[in-house]
Regions:
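Flexible "arm" and connector segments at domain edges
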Residues: 1-63, 67-104
Length: 104
């Protein structure tokens, strides 16, 4: 896993203990799942708009926001990037049709 993702996951875990008044991430945790999901949705929409616009720098910027808030959601549910990477590894080598069929 990327060192950056690992370090970010560690910081996100630490933020669970911080005061919501002193940390943006801690404030998201304090507000709960619905607020975190709203942020993930907002960032997903902004990523879509950036993708449509075709500005590579903006696509990267918005994708970073999306990844960050997705990682907040993972941490809020006691998950981390390793869990997602494990699932991607499971899917690697499967055709899209095989993977979809395995969910039934």
């Amino acid at each position: 896993m990327s060192d950056v993702l690992k370090m970010l996951a560690e910081v996100l875990e630490q933020r669970k203990q911080d005061s919501p008044e002193s940390s943006y991430t801690a404030s998201l945790y304090a507000k709960g799942t619905d607020t975190i999901l709203k942020k993930v949705g907002e960032e997903a929409a902004e990523t879509i708009i950036a993708g449509k616009g075709g500005d590579k720098e903006q696509i990267v910027y918005e994708t970073a926001d999306l990844w960050f808030h997705s990682m907040v959601l993972l941490a809020h549910n006691d998950l981390g990037p390793d869990d997602v990477l494990k699932e991607l590894g499971r899917r690697f080598g499967l055709s899209g049709l095989e993977e979809k069929a395995s969910r039934k």
